[in-house]
A protein has these predicted regions:
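Intrinsically disordered, low-complexity repeat tracts enriched in Gly/Pro/Ser/Thr and acidic residues
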Residues: 5-6, 17-270
Length: 270
């Protein structure tokens, strides 16, 4: 007897604001939901005691899941082997008689396995590879907002190289780790600006270069989406260059000041 996961919705993780400067504000990136961490499946063939089999009442073919709620039911249109869903077909989940998740694709021993499409009640969907009941392999998650995440998935989570595209066309290409943008990556803005560098838990952190559409640029250290540490801002309309230590997006040198990822008010300059 093997285990298949029930409905597993993606949740909003955080907002990822863009850096800002004194000469020209940068638009907010908006929310970038990243799939939440999913529970680990038991080893196939060794289900926990609190597992239940959910059967199609018309065919008797079923799947097995952990801690199934009493009001869950399914409808399976494909083949059945040893009373478990097998091969290509459509698996429709119901909760209290109301349709919820819908899976169209390949099954093996009652588990999502191979190519498939999983559609959620909020109209979000995942299309790609599954393994042992999890999103595993190459796939694309499409959010209700129209945002898209295309990546390598491992045990249900984006892991490795991938691309996230916001509804407004801004896009991130780079590393994902532990369900977050972590590692090296690039954000490309629709206005022609870009950031290339390091990320930690979805934020610009480490060394990186931010270039604005008007030619201004900051190159140096970042923390929490702000210039923090040693860095240089240059290329503004007035031609000034600011080199030195930055703190929480703020820089002051005698009578001059500048911001990257902060506002003049938050830095106490106004």
């Amino acid at each position: 007897m093997r285990i298949v996961l029930p409905s597993l919705l993606f949740a909003v993780a955080a907002c990822f604001p863009a850096a800002a400067q004194t000469s020209r504000p940068v638009p907010e990136l908006g929310t970038a939901p990243i799939p939440r961490q999913l529970p680990t499946l038991p080893t196939p063939g060794q289900p926990p005691a609190a597992s239940d089999e959910v059967k199609d009442p018309k065919t008797g073919c079923g799947v097995v899941m952990m801690n199934a709620e009493p009001n869950l039911s399914i409808s399976w249109s494909g083949a059945c082997d040893f009373d478990l869903a097998q091969g290509k077909g459509v698996l429709q989940w119901f909760k209290g008689g109301v349709p919820t998740d819908r899976y169209e694709g390949e099954m093996k021993d009652g588990l999502y396995e191979g190519q498939g499409k999983l559609t959620y009640p909020n109209k979000a969907r995942y299309e790609g590879e599954f393994k042992a009941g999890e999103r595993d392999g190459k796939g694309t998650y499409i959010f209700p907002s129209g945002a898209r995440l295309t990546a390598e998935f491992r045990e249900g989570r984006p892991q490795g190289h991938g691309m996230y595209v916001w509804p407004n066309g801004n896009r991130y290409i780079g590393d994902f780790r532990d369900n977050q943008r972590t590692g090296r990556g690039t954000i490309m803005f629709t206005d022609g600006g870009r950031y290339e560098g390091e990320f930690v838990n979805g934020k610009m952190q480490g060394r990186g270069v931010r270039v604005w559409a008007n030619g201004s640029r900051y190159e140096g250290e970042w923390a929490d989406d702000k210039a923090s540490g040693w860095g240089t801002k240059s290329g503004g309309p007035d031609g000034q260059v600011f080199t030195g230590m930055w703190t929480n997006g703020c820089f002051r040198d005698n009578q001059r000041w500048a911001t990257v990822g902060a506002t003049a008010a938050s830095c106490g300059f106004q």
